[in-house]
Amino acid sequence: MTRVKRGNVARKRRKKILKLASGFRGAHSRLFRVANQQVMKALRYAYNDRNKRKRDFRALWIARINASARLEGMTYSKLMGSLKKLNIILNRKSLSQLAIYDKDAFMEILKTIP
């Protein structure tokens, strides 16, 4: 069997991992084996947290809408149910923006609900 020389390939692979690990503390940024484990874990966390961020923002929007609606004596679930019945299509993000930055517009929306 012929000899396979892969010094350049191996060096490039290790450099890539160590570059991704720069900024980690201690051996996690210097030793390849430890750095490789930490990079894999960090990438896994990054992937999971990109999806978690979507859940967190939705929860934040719902909390803001609920707080503003309760000031006017209405719960979040009743508000969303009424909007759906009246075919008022506003997503939670824009509703929460209205609730925070444009109270008058939010109150107008609440007035349309019987």
Swiss-Prot record:
Q: Does the keyword Nucleus apply?
A: no
UniProt xrefs under InterPro entries: Ribosomal_bL20 (IPR005813), RIBOSOMAL_L20_CS (IPR049946), Ribosomal_protein_bL20_C (IPR035566)
Cellular component, GO annotation: cyanelle; ribonucleoprotein complex; ribosome
Role: Binds directly to 23S ribosomal RNA and is necessary for the in vitro assembly process of the 50S ribosomal subunit. It is not involved in the protein synthesizing functions of that subunit.
Organism per entry: Cyanophora paradoxa
Q: Which gene encodes it?
A: rpl20
Keyword RNA-binding on entry: yes
Subcellular localization is given as: Plastid, Cyanelle
The similarity annotation says: Belongs to the bacterial ribosomal protein bL20 family.
Its BP terms in the Gene Ontology are: translation
The highest taxon in the source lineage is: Eukaryota
Name the UniProt record assigns to this protein:
Large ribosomal subunit protein bL20c
- CDD domains per record: Ribosomal_L20 (cd07026)
Keyword list, A-Z: Cyanelle, Plastid, Ribonucleoprotein, Ribosomal protein, RNA-binding, rRNA-binding
